[in-house]
Structure formats: C-alpha cells, structure tokens
Amino acid sequence: MTNEFLHFEKISRQTWQSLHRKTTPPLTEEELESIKSFNDQISLQDVTDIYLPLAHLIQIYKRTKEDLAFSKGIFLQRESKSQPFIIGVSGSVAVGKSTTSRLLQILLSRTFTDATVELVTTDGFLYPNQTLIEQGILNRKGFPESYDMEALLNFLDRIKNGQDVDIPVYSHEVYDIVPEEKQSVKAADFVIVEGINVFQNPQNDRLYITDFFDFSIYVDAGVDDIESWYLDRFLKMLSLAQNDPDSYYYRFTQMPIGEVEAFAHQVWTSINLTNLQNYIEPTRNRAEVILHKSKNHEIDEIYLKK
C-alpha cells in the first residue's frame, strides 16, 4: 500500500480480533456454508475474529449517526426523520464481496434486535445486453459506462428517504438482466449495497455515490490471487452449467478445457484486470475499512480510516 493510505491505520488480524469480546457466532456452520460464494473460503473462526468486531464497529458508527441526527433536529427545531443505515461494499470481481455482504446481512439482523437488513447488488443496474450491443459497448460490460448510474443514484436517494423501491434483477447464469423480474427493496434499518462500482463517481460528478453511504468496506487482495480465484470460479461455473443449455456458461462446456482456460484468462486480462486497475482499485481509499485477504482467502490485515 502506498502513501495514499497514510490516513488509514493498519491493524493485524491478531490485534483486530482482540478489539471485541469473544462470543459465539450467531450462525451455524451450515448457514455459513450456504451464504458463501461457491469458490470462496470462510470459517466460523473468521466470523469470530473479523466479522464480529466489524459488526461492533458498524454499531458504533450507527449510534454516532443517530446522535448527530438527533442533535441536528434540535438545532433545526424539528423532529429528525429516521433513515436507513447504508453500507457500501466494493472490491474486484471474484474477491469475495458477495460472501462479505451476505454474512453482514445475517450478523446485523441478529446483532440488532428486530433489525431489517436489505441486500442489493449493483449488477441490477447494468444496462441490458441489447442496450450495450446497440451502444457498441458489450465488450465494456462491467466498466463504468455499462451501468445506468442515474438509476442507481435515484435508487439510493429513494432508499435514503425511506421509500420502497423495485429494481431490476441480474442473472450471472444468463449473463443479462432478467426481463420482467424485479427485486422489491423495502424500507429497512440497514441497506447493504454491493458492487464493483459503488465507490466510483458517476458522470454527473456533482453527486457522489459515496455521499449516500454511512459506512463503507473494500475487500482487497493481491492481483495474482484474485486472478487465480476468478479462473477457478469460471471453471466451477462450467460444472454447474453442464446440463443447462440456457446458461451463459453452457457453450464453454462443449469446448476443450485448454480453449476454455485460454478464453477465461483473456477475459480476465482484457476486462477484469483492466477494470480493477483503472476504475476499481483507485477507489479503495474511499472506504472506511479495507479488508485485505491473503492467498488462502483469509483476512490477514485490516485498514481503518483514521
């Protein structure tokens, strides 16, 4: 990490786990297995060492936000309106954002009594493939211009104001937005927004996505490790698609494995690596917390903004 991280405090895993009293994780091994991405690795020990202290830190931020809102209400001589606590989770493709987000959803719903927690991925704000084809940018899918950022900002604004919102659903199996299908996002105590682009600036740079976040997390790892995880995930998707002709990955099951590996590597190099280096990683220092993962997926270092 370079000088851009001078305003972060680096904390070892050993020190981090000591910042929260030891308690039993509020979920079972089976529940943890069911929420992790199928090529990710996480244990109940990780929950105890990393995520319970993180949930406690979020609790501190939430309490601070509520105190500030109350004080503002007194200053403005009006009752403060309840708003959801919005958490942004970013990082590269295949780094483990989804596992982190789903785990936080469970922990927050069980740490805060009767709390409602909604989880949204920004994949739903990708333009449909047909739109990308018409604009000549299908090969730029995942890059900033392939997202309907205006719709994402509008969603965040409505959620921030306690409204229920219906948003599009994206399927990784068909590699496209699912027509006529919507995710109904209800007004909640917490809303977790996960995606590679959640710290990026929209083309209208007068309004920043991060302005809507009360807390933000970047899941980080070495580039070589992420590439290995991506290629592993790609090949595992083939095994799931063998008997599903509707899957985007089905066509690859008909190809020699060498050609498939070469294709996946080319996609990583030309799209995912380029996107990471040019658009995703440069936003890393906008997070409140950076979780750094080692080669075996274990979080070994935590960076907390000073």
From Swiss-Prot:
Superkingdom of origin organism: Bacteria
Coiled-coil zones: none
Keyword entries, A-Z: ATP-binding, Coenzyme A biosynthesis, Cytoplasm, Kinase, Nucleotide-binding, Transferase
CDD domains: PanK
EC nos: 2.7.1.33
GO biological process: coenzyme A biosynthetic process
Chain positions recorded as ATP binding sites: G91, S92, V93, A94, V95, G96, K97, S98
GO CC aspect terms: cytoplasm
Compartments in which it is found: Cytoplasm
A Pfam family hit: PRK
Reaction(s) catalysed (UniProt annotation): (R)-pantothenate + ATP = (R)-4'-phosphopantothenate + ADP + H(+)
Family label: Belongs to the prokaryotic pantothenate kinase family.
PANTHER family: URIDINE KINASE (PTHR10285)
Protein name stated in the entry: Pantothenate kinase
Organism of origin: Streptococcus pneumoniae serotype 2 (strain D39 / NCTC 7466)
